[in-house]
């Protein structure tokens, strides 16, 4: 992933200043080019399991439009540790495949592109697997806000519909409006320091909490009347695709330092196929140990 060098923008923060709410009406619908959204996601590392040729291991499910056909599903992991766990399971269940398989960094833009394409042509699909602890943290937040309720052991939305999960992203928001708070930061990239304004959404709640605690100690007035909220990745992408508010272009997804470091270590010598170039790879069918056969555009 050549563009992983640009992750220094988010990984090398020198200092940051939490500012006022950045979006007047979060979720306002108009239009933002898909290309721009994918570009924003292009520097966000996620992880795949690939074979010895660098081709993603996939699995097949019945095509939702034609049960006589198959849909090839690509699996992406938000956490490299979850990818390692899945790889170990494959080594146990299918040693002939797992013995030559490895974990490869990929761009989140590739996963989202496949998901968008699958809406038009479900020949391919995508399964994005979130970190379980982060999903649990998200559920707790949504219960506290009243957006989720638990009835008879089932988690439901406030409208009474089953909660379908997703990949949670945590952000600092204005307590009254719920609008995300922007950050103005001094970032170091290629040995140079510059100022950048962006709206960070974190995959790890505790990572955001540490940032907020540090800001509160230094400038308590900057984070007054704010709180941590959560949005699912698919909802955020849908918002980015449906708004022309210029501040939407300032959205940045912040991976964990561990994930960034893992991806950067691979970027020097890993020639694995980029996911957004892998619409039709000749890859073996993966054992369905991830439970991914429930949909072709799923953000669990």
Which residues does each predicted region cover?
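Conserved NAD+-utilizing ADP-ribose enzyme module
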Residues: 2-300
């Amino acid at each position: 992933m050549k563009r992983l060098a640009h992750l220094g923008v988010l990984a090398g923060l020198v200092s940051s200043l939490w500012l006022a709410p950045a979006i007047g009406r979060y979720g306002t619908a108009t239009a933002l080019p898909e290309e721009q959204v994918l570009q924003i996601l292009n520097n966000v590392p996620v992880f795949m399991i690939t074979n010895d040729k660098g081709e993603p291991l996939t699995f097949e499910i019945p095509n939702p439009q034609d049960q006589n056909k198959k849909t090839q599903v690509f699996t992406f992991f938000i956490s490299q540790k979850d990818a390692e766990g899945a790889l170990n399971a494959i080594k146990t269940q299918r040693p002939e495949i797992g013995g030559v398989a490895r974990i490869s960094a990929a761009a989140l833009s590739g996963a989202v592109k496949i998901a968008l394409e699958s809406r038009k042509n479900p020949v391919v699909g995508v399964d994005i697997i979130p970190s379980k602890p982060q999903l649990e943290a998200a559920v707790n937040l949504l219960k506290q806000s009243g957006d989720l309720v638990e009835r008879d052991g089932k988690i439901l939305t406030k409208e009474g519909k089953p909660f379908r999960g997703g990949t949670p992203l945590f952000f600092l928001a204005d307590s009254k409006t719920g609008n995300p708070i922007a950050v103005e930061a001094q970032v170091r990239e290629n040995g140079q320091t510059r100022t950048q304004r962006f709206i960070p959404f974190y995959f790890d709640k505790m990572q955001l909490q540490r940032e907020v605690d540090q800001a509160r100690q230094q400038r308590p007035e900057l984070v007054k009347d704010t709180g941590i909220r959560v949005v699912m990745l698919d909802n955020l992408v849908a918002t980015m695709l449906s708004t022309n508010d210029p501040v939407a272009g300032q959205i940045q997804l912040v991976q964990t330092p561990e994930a960034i470091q893992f991806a950067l270590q691979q970027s020097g010598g890993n020639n694995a196929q980029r996911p957004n170039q892998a619409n039709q790879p000749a890859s073996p069918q993966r054992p369905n140990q991830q439970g991914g056969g429930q949909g072709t555009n799923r953000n669990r």
